[in-house]
Amino acid sequence: MYKEINCRRIVPGIGTGKALVTKDVINFLAMVDTKSATIIDRNHELFGRSIKDIVLVFPNAVGSSVGAYAIYSLRINQVTPAAIICMNNADIITASGCAISDIPLVDMLEKLSSFILESEMEISVNADKEVVTIKTV
């Protein structure tokens, strides 16, 4: 069974993978090892987890505009997320980083009051059609 949720496209594209969900913001420059795509901040909920080939679900990024280049470094090192979902409005760091790295990015998911995204759920982000599809049990 699948559940579709409408969203807003920020960066076009399609990405599919297991969700990695956090309520913590991410500073891509300070918290992510751009060679391995691993969260290296010991105080972060996702410490030790890789964001490679997954659908990253988080509120938004924080930090300086250099964070966009940290996201681009993930692309150079071939360790990008399959797609990113910002649970808040997408911020300029994430939007510009995803744009230069060709990572699908969406925000403003509808219907989340009745549905909770959890890590390990299979998610497909189709930013082109502005829809997120979640495989449910």
For the regions a protein language model found, what residue spans apply to each?
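Feature captures the catalytic cores and cofactor-binding loops of soluble hydro-lyases/lyases
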Residues: 4-13, 20-131
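Short beta-strand-to-coil "C-cap" segments at the C-terminal boundary of structured domains/repeats
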Residues: 133-137
